[in-house]
């Protein structure tokens, strides 16, 4: 894992859920958790990052709403700054669909919240 990827995983960890790269979620994972898909970009480039939080249980709706509020505080309108070994990033909300509410296609009891971010990388 690169310094950028680890820094983003740690940043998203501030949402108080375990964070896994998409496709690498351990079989023994329990709800709730967050999956993350990171694009690759060279320094001075920008890339899209998608994080999806998944919830199951009686409080899934309330937990999902609380996470959405927390994500809006973590990534304010003006963006958030992140530094890591060898570089830095500005993290912004991606367009008009920053947060999208989801239901799992296989199990309608599983609720999700997709968070889309635009990340601009800088060389330090």
Regions found by a protein language model. Give the residues of each.
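A short, hydrophobic beta-strand-centered structural micro-motif
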Residues: 29-38
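Charged, amphipathic alpha-helical segments and their flanking helix caps
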Residues: 1-23, 37-124
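Short, glycine-/polar-rich solvent-exposed loops and beta-turns at beta-strand/coil boundaries
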Residues: 25-27
């Amino acid at each position: 894992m690169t310094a950028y990827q680890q820094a983003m995983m740690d940043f998203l960890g501030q949402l108080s859920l375990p964070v896994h790269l998409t496709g690498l979620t351990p079989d023994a994972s329990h709800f709730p958790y967050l999956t993350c898909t990171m694009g690759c970009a060279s320094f001075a480039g920008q890339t899209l990052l998608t994080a999806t939080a998944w919830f199951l249980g009686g409080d899934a709706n309330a937990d999902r709403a609380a996470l959405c509020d927390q994500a809006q505080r973590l990534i304010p309108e003006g963006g958030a700054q992140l530094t890591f070994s060898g570089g830095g990033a500005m993290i912004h909300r991606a367009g008009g669909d920053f947060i999208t509410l989801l239901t799992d296609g296989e199990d309608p009891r599983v609720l999700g919240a997709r968070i889309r971010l635009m990340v601009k990388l800088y060389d330090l």
